[in-house]
């Protein structure tokens, strides 16, 4: 699993507008739209040897927030993910109270423990 590679890929779509876990620059200012937030949401053992996990499957959620529907930006993000080796699933798309749009993707990565 390489979150730094994922960050670099996402940052190529929206330069300096990619955040881990939240969209907060600091305690006072939030990022202006559009921006991307990504975070690990699950980490489950996928294979065992002698009751010890060999590797984990990690699901990472990627949320792109835009002021309004932006199909070109969506296509760009999806193409960058695919070109970077990240197969994605689109989980949902919904409007926020301020009429902004969240488009939520998920990717699955593997984290190996006992590499021989």
Placement of each model-derived feature along the sequence:
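Short, charged interaction patches at domain edges and termini
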Residues: 1-9, 41-55, 91-116
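Short, compact, well-ordered microdomains
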Residues: 71-104
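Small/polar-rich, solvent-exposed N-terminal microdomains that initiate assembly or binding
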Residues: 1-48, 69
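Broad gene-expression machinery/nucleic-acid interaction feature
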Residues: 33-35, 59-61, 102-104
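Short glycine-rich, basic-tinged beta-strand/loop micro-motifs
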Residues: 54-66
